[in-house]
Amino acid sequence: MRKAKPKKRYLLPDPKFSDTMVTKFVNSLMYDGKKSTAYSIFYDAVALVEKKTSESGLEVWKKALNNVSPQVEVRSRRVGGSTFQVPTEVRPDRKMALGMKWLINYARSRGEKTMTDKLAGEIISASKGEGAAVKKRDDVHRMAEANKAFSHFRF
């Protein structure tokens, strides 16, 4: 265990939308420290979403992120020699982090040609409440629902 809780690091807002959430998303999208490439992928994807849906691209992205973020998850807790999957509520910062991670990972595994297309496709489908990332969220919720009996083993 660490001695003290680490100080929270605050991110600078992104240049185009001046939103710290976008910066966080781009940071998880980035490979090998190539932030400018990650920014161009994200901005192009948002523009593509705007073109396809004729709504604000950033709003569609935020809606998609809310649809993908889990409310509850299961955590392993060892009680007397057996391990239980205990459903717990997800903290707001972790909720967003998981949503971003899932959105990016499932966008990467899509079939389109470029990452911009993949990300735009996943954002659009997630905002409609479908797609692989939303399915992952539902699986996590289903797992928590199935293990509701162990919710008295709080952390």
UniProtKB/Swiss-Prot annotation:
GO terms (BP aspect): translation
GO terms under cellular component: small ribosomal subunit
Keyword list, A-Z: Ribonucleoprotein, Ribosomal protein, RNA-binding, rRNA-binding, tRNA-binding
Molecular functions per Gene Ontology: rRNA binding; structural constituent of ribosome; tRNA binding
Pfam families: Ribosomal_S7
NCBIfam families linked to this entry: rpsG_bact (TIGR01029)
Family: Belongs to the universal ribosomal protein uS7 family.
Function as written in the Swiss-Prot or TrEMBL entry: One of the primary rRNA binding proteins, it binds directly to 16S rRNA where it nucleates assembly of the head domain of the 30S subunit. Is located at the subunit interface close to the decoding center, probably blocks exit of the E-site tRNA.
Record text on subunit structure and interactions: Part of the 30S ribosomal subunit. Contacts proteins S9 and S11.
Designated name of the protein: Small ribosomal subunit protein uS7
Species for this entry: Cytophaga hutchinsonii (strain ATCC 33406 / DSM 1761 / CIP 103989 / NBRC 15051 / NCIMB 9469 / D465)
Phylogenetic placement of the source organism: Bacteria, Pseudomonadati, Bacteroidota, Cytophagia, Cytophagales
